[in-house]
């Protein structure tokens, strides 16, 4: 399945041409964050790249809050996320839309797949899937080998009485050579292809708890919102063939895909909300102004030539996909460097290891006693940071 023959407009080289040139469709990008916690630096980088790419092409941005999962149904975090984007100066032109308001659209799409005989109930548990020691897809999920694909109606009824099934989408078998392979061109990582039967397997479109799967929801939403360009972290590169296959089945257009490198911690971990890596609340306090944060981030990731404070608008002229392609390896972000970069004066520069070691022993009540043990007055910026960290314990 070669998507380049379907609804995909590829950029043309500049230069003279005698052929008539049609006006390209306007670019529509999107922010699609999940309110499962405060944004971290990696989330900011992803949103920044999506915004810069759309704006550099005269395009628009749609904001969609992906809150299908129970852990994401937190209005206060969604409101904080929206406030953070506004503070960064990453304005959007449409939205915010909330996925929890769009369940009827996902239900309609799923029913279309079911009516075509493309889905089946799956009773396998997560533990069973991992215990099977199956090969894993490019996104780390086990490749499903079809244990429930051929269940009889009687067996489905018997198992359904015991537990609710998930719903899986059938992918072409290895014998369906014309449709088995999905090909696409990623704006950063180039030509990609995946054999669905051997590298992906039948995948979920609805979980056993009734929640629609990410793959189905984003495909429906991107089409409904007119999204023509998807910019996101390279950890989602492996999801793209599944989404393209769903677009093909549902008769939906395929956007351009552009995956960007991940920001990593110094110990090799991907930055995450769960691990409480530096979030935007702390970054806003330390950098003070959005221009300082965005300029520093642009300098660290190669978007700009240096870390000079710049607004999002000022970074548009520096943005180039050629630069992203040249720096497509994952980028290590050093927390100590951030602490030092944002210190107001030399005597306020912090050793993040000391900060962490101290705050693990502190309660808010014990903070003043800790300050009294110091040989000299604590700089105000340091004191504020430690107070906040102590309150988290």
Feature-to-residue mapping (PLM):
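Short linear interaction segments
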Residues: 359-393
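Short, basic amphipathic alpha-helical segments that act as recognition/interaction helices
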Residues: 344-358
């Amino acid at each position: 399945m070669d998507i380049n023959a379907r609804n995909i407009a590829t950029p043309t080289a500049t230069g003279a041409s005698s052929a008539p040139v049609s006006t390209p469709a306007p670019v529509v990008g999107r922010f699609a964050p999940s309110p499962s916690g405060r944004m971290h630096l990696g989330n900011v980088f992803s949103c920044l790249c999506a915004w810069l790419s759309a704006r550099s092409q005269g395009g628009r941005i749609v904001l969609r809050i992906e809150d299908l999962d129970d852990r994401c149904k937190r209005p206060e975090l969604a409101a904080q996320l929206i406030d953070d984007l506004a503070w960064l100066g990453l304005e959007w032109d449409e939205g915010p839309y909330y996925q929890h308001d769009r369940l009827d659209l996902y239900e309609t799409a799923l029913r279309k797949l079911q009516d075509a005989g493309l889905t089946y109930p799956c009773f396998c548990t997560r533990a069973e899937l991992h215990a099977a020691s199956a090969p894993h897809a490019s996104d780390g999920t086990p490749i499903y080998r079809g244990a429930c694909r051929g269940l009889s109606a009687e067996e489905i009824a018997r198992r359904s009485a015991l537990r609710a099934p998930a719903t899986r989408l059938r992918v072409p078998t290895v014998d369906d050579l014309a449709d088995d392979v999905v090909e696409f061109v990623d704006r950063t990582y180039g030509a990609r292809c995946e054999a669905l039967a051997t590298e992906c397997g039948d995948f979920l479109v609805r979980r056993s708890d009734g929640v629609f799967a990410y793959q189905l929801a984003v495909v429906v939403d991107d089409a409904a919102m007119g999204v023509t360009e998807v910019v996101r972290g390279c950890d989602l590169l492996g999801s793209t063939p599944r989404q393209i296959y769903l677009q093909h089945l549902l008769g939906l257009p395929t956007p351009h895909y552009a995956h960007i490198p991940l920001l990593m911690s110094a110990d090799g971990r991907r930055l995450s909300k769960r691990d409480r890596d530096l979030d935007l609340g702390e970054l806003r306090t330390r950098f003070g102004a959005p221009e300082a944060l965005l300029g520093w981030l642009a300098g660290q990731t190669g978007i700009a030539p240096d870390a000079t404070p710049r607004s999002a608008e000022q970074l548009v002229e520096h943005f180039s996909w050629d630069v992203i392609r040249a720096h497509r390896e994952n980028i290590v972000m050093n927390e100590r460097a951030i602490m030092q970069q944002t210190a107001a004066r030399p005597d306020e520069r912090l050793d993040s290891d000391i900060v962490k070691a101290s705050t693990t022993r502190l309660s808010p009540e014990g903070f003043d006693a800790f300050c009294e043990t110091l040989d000299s007055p604590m700089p105000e910026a340091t004191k504020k940071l430690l107070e906040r960290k102590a309150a988290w314990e």
